[in-house]
Structures are given as structure tokens and as C-alpha cells.
Amino acid sequence: MRLIVVSGQSGAGKSVALRVLEDLGYYCVDNLPVSLLTAFIQSVQGSQQNVAVSIDIRNLPKEPSLVQDVLDQLKQNNDVSMLFLDASKETLLKRYSETRRIHPLSLSQSKPSLAQAIELEKQLLGPLKEQADLLLDSSNQSLHELSETVRMRIEGRERKDLVMVFQSFGFKYGLPTDADYVFDVRFLPNPHWEPDLRPLTGLDAPIKSFLEGHSEVMELKQQIQKFFEYWLPMLEKNNRSYLTIAIGCTGGKHRSVYLTQQLGEYFAQLGHQVQLRHTSLEKQQS
């Protein structure tokens, strides 16, 4: 039986993650106290159905190490992993403002402000975040985008082969926090300064022709390919389920999109499990 423990900051998307897991066939339980987790797993052990349980700030034990003790015990007979959802303070403030919901810690005796409650929760969940097998940052993601990200990562972990996630992004939108490797390609020739090319993206043939006409672009692509070809066997031996490679340019529209697509297709042709995401491009087109 497989158990996924879902945790994270209030407002970061735990309920979204649980809905996705339910769609994937998991038996889901929301806000189960840690003290009841072992007994609950024992009660469903015979069903052979995968299970997902959410744990949040309201049902955490006072001693954070108790969570790890329970998970370590369950790992002896089950496939256990933890999914932790995070988001920036600005994103959480905006979400609470839009939904007008009350933060769980705002109901405590000290009655902290929303900003103070978010900071306090971040500190309290710190030890849990460090134990996470899968960390997702939902900042600036829509419900649909977050659902697709969760689905992609969970389905990737269910496969035994390492999944290579190639992700393009724009630095002006911020760094992706869940990347294992980040390549800054802003030094490459920029199609943005060509009026005829500016409206296009790195997926369009004229952009490909422009970039492939510069030797430094092709050299960088080959060096990245060689780097991962050499080290991928070691990464696979390290019991990883996925590897996220983020490639960024200024706006995430031309150079990073081209390289991300090319690298993803290259490793897919070699027989690797590959997932492609053009995060900034998706934002611009939505």
C-alpha cells in the first residue's frame, strides 16, 4: 500500500492536492491527527488501496519529531512519502484577502494578524518541510496549474524510472523554488530585439532558426546534454523519482523555451521519462 502525507501552509493548496489524489484513485482523509495515523493505516491495510492523508497546523503534535517517528514506523511496511505545499507570503496574503477566510492561527489566544499568523505557521512547519519528499511551490499558480503540477509529479513518482522535468521560466517572474538545477541563459542572443521575431515564441520555427544560427546557443545545448548524460546514472541510483531542470531567460518566451523544448525532446528520444513545462509562456498565453 502506498501512503502520501500531504502537508503545507494554510492556503498553499492542500485541498487541491487531495482532490487530485482522489481523482487518481487514492482514498483521502483530510486533517487526520498524527496520533491516529498508525491506527488508521492499520484499519485500511487489507484493502490494498493507496491512501492520502493531510496534516496541517491544527493537528500537529507539539513535538515535531513525533511526526517523523510515526512516518518512520509506517515506512517499515508501506511505501510512504510526504508532499509539502508552500507559497510565498505575498501569495498567501492575496489568497486570504480574496477568499476572506480566517487563518487557523488567527484564532489562537494571542490573536496574531494575518501576516504574523503566516510567519508563525512557516516557522512551526519548518521541520515538516525539511522531511518532505516532494516540495511544490504554488505561488502565482492558478487552481488548474496547481492541479496539473500535482498530477504530473504524483504520476511521475508512481513510475519506477526517474522522471526528468524540463521547465522554462522568465526571471522577471521569479525563480522556480522546486528546481534541482537552474540554468541562466540570459547571456545568449535575444530574439526579442528583432521586431519580426518578438511576437513569436521559442516553439516557433523562425525563433529556432535564429537561435540555431548562433554557435554559442548550440554549444550550451550540447554542454547541458553532456552534463546530464554523464551524471544521470548517479542521480537515478540516488533513489530519486524526478529531476527538475529549470532554464530561464528574461521573459521566459524565447531562449529558455527553445532550449527547454530541445533538451526535453533530446532526452525523450534517448528513452527517458520526460515532462515539459513552459511556466512563464503559459502565464502569458492564459
From Swiss-Prot:
Molecular function terms, GO-annotated: ATP binding; GTP binding; molecular adaptor activity
Keyword set, alphabetical order: ATP-binding, GTP-binding, Nucleotide-binding
Residues the entry annotates as binding GTP: 56-59
List of residues binding ATP: 8-15
Protein's UniProt keywords contain ATP-binding: yes
InterPro entries named in the record: P-loop_NTPase, RapZ-like, RapZ-like_N, RapZ_C
Signal sequence region: none
Functional summary from the UniProt entry: Displays ATPase and GTPase activities.
Family: Belongs to the RapZ-like family.
Protein name: Nucleotide-binding protein VC_2532
